[in-house]
Curated annotation (Swiss-Prot):
A Pfam family the protein falls into: Carbam_trans_C
Species for this entry: Sinorhizobium fredii (strain NBRC 101917 / NGR234)
GO MF annotations in UniProt: transferase activity
Biological role: Involved in 6-O-carbamoylation of Nod-factors.
TM ranges: none
Gene3D superfamilies reported for this sequence: 3.30.420.40, Carbamoyltransferase, C-terminal domain
Entry's EC annotation: 2.1.3.-
InterPro entries attached to this UniProt entry: Carbam_trans_C, Carbam_trans_C_sf, Carbtransf_dom, NodU/CmcH_Carbamoyltrnsfr, Nodul_NodU
Gene Ontology terms describing biological process: biosynthetic process
Classification via NCBIfam families: nodul_NodU
Record-given protein name: Nodulation protein U
Amino acid sequence: MRVCGIKLTHDGAIAVVEDGRLVFCTEQEKRNNNSRYQEINNLDAVVAALAENGVNARDVDQFVIDGWDGEAESQFKVLSGETPVILRGAPYVERHAEGLLDWIGGSGLTLGDRVFSYRSYPHVTSHVASAYCTSPFAKSGDPALCLVWDGCIFPRLYHVEGKRASFVKSLFPVTGQAYAAAGHYFGPYKQTSRGGWDLGVAGKLMAFIALGSVHERIVAVFQKLYQEHFAGDTALACAFRANINNSESSLAAVHDFFAASALQLGAEAPEDVLASSHFFLERLLVDEMANALQHHPLPGARNLCIAGGCGLNIKWNSALRETGLFDSVWVPPFPNDSGSAIGAACCEIVAQQGFVPLDWSVYSGPSLQAGKVPAGWHASPCSISEVAAILASNKPVVFLSGRSELGPRALGGRSILAAATSPEMKDHLNEIKFREHFRPVAPICLEDRAPDIFSPGTPDPYMLFDHQTKMPWQDKVPAVVHLDGSARLQTISRNSQHKVAEVLVEYEKLTGIPLLCNTSANYHGRGFFPSAAAACEWGRVEHVWCDGMLYRKPSATA
């Protein structure tokens, strides 16, 4: 069976699953230097993605469109070529506890000169399906809890087992937008307007809080206002909880909460306020998860999957793992909506077969494209050992290999690699990428060496947990040490078939150091480079390696 999942709104993507195997997933931001979070506003993008991967729309057995905003159903206004099309979709959240797999059928999916029928499952269902079906629990057939916390919903807990999944409870009445909304009122992204929502702010704030400290007096203010605005018996809190299905009113309530916070905390250092806000939400998450498990005991459910945009918060993921409530915690590399097309396709598989495992690779994104390299760049064959030598000479390299990684984080397929041995390298990488000085640079490290350098240093192939850099190594690899000593670590086996693992092995032979700086290769505010030509046109790194060829800028020396 061949299923095509489609995510039309922000983080637009097309994914095809065939007989239980992920064939590809094309996120629109990773095509043609598109903007981050690019939506699909023309169905021609679906036709193009299918064609690029050798699939004809007529050969798809079932199209599935991810659901979106709406209490009973959603609506999408798109184009097919130049023709306006209106498509019905499922709502954001299931309508009853056992309704995750309730679907809405539609017609009018116009792809080229043909019109197809489709199904649509709730948006939350795609998160549950993508998280569980890619997990080790699906492979072993074990049950799991699944936490979904997205921008405009409360954190929702589900129980997945066999052929069914059911809603357990909402942990507490705070929408995921709260994290980024705090940045409208405190810190470097403070705004005078409530508009101009930036999906990238939450991650930047996560970096900024390393400059601050948690203070219980600030946390106490957030706790008091939380009761007044969200959780208590006040008229304000009751109205908020009653209108949660209205995304505009729920966001306005979050803004009101932080506006009230700003009135009481205006004299505090913004970095301390944001650090305390982060901690307040983290403690609330951990405490309410523990309460949920105490009041809703589920035999055998000692596994946890995490999905939704808040699943990109590595500190919260680690805090949940460190509670001891779970034997194992799984976060896919695409917990946010970048995984929703995959999840939409999985919904149909689940409806037919139950929560079966998906055969997948994180390197299932778009293939590298051909393109004309700018005049003056010198191209020559280049071995992996030669790449390692360039890196050992303290020169960064844009490293492009095979198919792109899935999700928002560069994992060695569309990366800028660099030696981590000087503190200046972090500043240099932030400068060439037009990033703030406090932003961290991630390490990519050989898995077997990671416990020597990081704590816990456990396998983390997708950069989804927090690690502390051990003291002897903080001076050896300062470029990957964040301001609070932490690191957003990616580990990779030295036996991996991916070329970036070979680079690390060769670099270790030359230097004794088993890690490198790893940051995404892209224009500022755009998706990953689709080609070597794009990286050369960008031109802010003098060496570009692409599947065996090294491109050198005219001013560069090897």
